[in-house]
Every structure is written in structure tokens, then in C-alpha cells.
Amino acid sequence: MKYIGPFLRMNSLKRENIENQLFYFSKESLKYLVLNSKCGLTIPTKDLLKSTSKFDINIFKSNSPLLCVYKKGNCKLDLENNVLSLNYKKFKKEFNIFSNSLMTLSILEMAEYYDGFKGIDSEKYNLGRLYKGLARKQLEFYAANLRTPEGVFTDKVDSSDELFDETKLENKNEKFRFSDHILMMDAYYRYSIMLNDSISQSYRVFSKDILNMIMNFKEEIYTVSTDELSKICLGLNIYFNYCN
């Protein structure tokens, strides 16, 4: 990132140059966060690719894909075993619904981008396939672990004991937020229209159920804060774009 300042100050830059450079930074940042940061709960790559045919696991065997991303981590990298990595002791082990739904949406958008490399660059194309498989696992995890018994998505705290290989999550705040559910609706709907697999139709129905719930309680939106309203507008605009 230390080069972005001088880059943007160049007088000869065109809008297209800036857009391309920012896109590169964003996709590489997403790739590092999702596959290498370990800033959250991870899934072994071999487990992720079991259902993916004709996939060379050696390409991504050193990665640790995220099922769910933590709320916060220190961006300063530490050198450990000759590898730069985030300091896991600085992680704030909370799972934010809004952040995780945005992560999955970003993964799906990049998966569509990498689809364009079919027959051109096998490594990039396979990265897109990996993203699709990861998005499915993430959505399965959210539905099973980030909801209350009543089915409401809620932020969680990771209280797992490092001595035991078992994930333990506790509710942090059971307050209902429209924006959380709308972004989750977007993520499930995006998956359903992008892939044609055994779970796609179920995800589409699930996203429609969330939409119906939002419509049934739409009068409550008038009472939310300006910040929450901005997030609601963002989520609804994303959904509208996907529907068209």
C-alpha cells in the first residue's frame, strides 16, 4: 500500500488506470484475507475440494480458507518461520454478520470474474472454483451457526478452547438488525442465481423468505438510525441489481 500514494499523485493517470489499480489491490487483499490471513475459523482445503472434480489440490494446499472472519485483527504483519502473517493474539474473536455477508458476496463476485479465465489461465480459473466452493461452505456455516433458535442472524463470540478441536460460539448481541438480514439475503440469492447445484434452489427460497420477513416488518425501518438506514439502502440496491 505504500506505493498507492505516489501512484495516485501521477499527473498522467486516467480514470481507467486508477480503476484497474484499485481493482487489483482489492482482489489481492480479498485473496490474502480469505485464503492466508487465518483471521477467523478456517476449513482445510482438502475438505473444501472433496466435492470438486478434476481439481489439483496442490495449487492451494498451503492455504487456510476462512469459513467465518473475525471482527478485527492487527494489520501489522509478523515474521514467523520466514512467512509474514497476522498476529493471531491480536484477533478480536467476534463474528459480525454484516462483515461476513460482505465477505461472501465479494468472493462470489470474484468467482464470476475468474470464470472468464476458463481455457486461458487454469490457475485463475481454479481460484474461481475454489471461491465458489468456499462461498457454499460459508453460507452453510452461517445458517447453522450464526442464528438464534428462532432463526434470527446474530453476531457471535468465538469462545472455543484451543486445547479442544471443537468450535463453541456464544451470542454477543441478539438485537435484530435489518441490514444484517438484507446482506445475508443478498449473499444467498447471489449464490442461487450464479450456481446450479443441489443447494441453489434452497438458497433462493431462503433469500425470498428473508425478503418476505423484511416486507412484513417494513414499518419498523422508519425508526432505525441513519447509519442503519444507509446499510439497508446498500443491501436493497445490491438485491435489486441481482434481480435485474
Over which residues does each language-model region extend?
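Glycan-recognition and catalytic cores of secretory/periplasmic carbohydrate-active enzymes
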Residues: 1-244
